[in-house]
Amino acid sequence: DGTVWTWGLNDSNQLGYETENGMSLEPKKVTLGANNEQAVLIAAGDKYNLAIGMSSKVYSWGNNNNGQLGNGNDDRSATGIDTVKYKDGTDVEGAVGISTHGNTAYILLANGTVAVFGEEYDNQNYASIVSGLNNILQVSGNYALSISGEVWKMSKDNIPTKVMGYKDDNGNELSILKI
């Protein structure tokens, strides 16, 4: 039904709500935005979490010591859930995929581009588009799969690197979709 439930340790507010003893043994509902939006995808990072709502906005909560909440500030998300924003303060919209890699987060957008924020991008606390990365179909960790089957690694310098694939008997490089 699109409800996000969390429980466990809450030392960095990663549960998305306040707890009395820094933990919750019982699952409790996480409220996404003022309208309690339903989630379509979730991703867990290192003591922080992300969720894509039905509106295609991305919500984040938890530890923010490396800008991994992407909400434009350096504060931990104490109790609230915030939306991921661009540098100009507008919400990231059009999200169709999310992924985390340590304290860095990646958002796949409907137009085939990827937005990134967090530790591997100089602790950047807002989303920016990875330059040179287009026609992406899926993100996982800090890797991206293109529609043509190429695998790209996203790295600290904001320049994606093509990961070499397998070769056929004639030495021709095969895309991941042809393996």
Regions found by a protein language model. Give the residues of each.
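Eukaryote-biased RCC1-like beta-propeller repeat architecture
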Residues: D1-I179
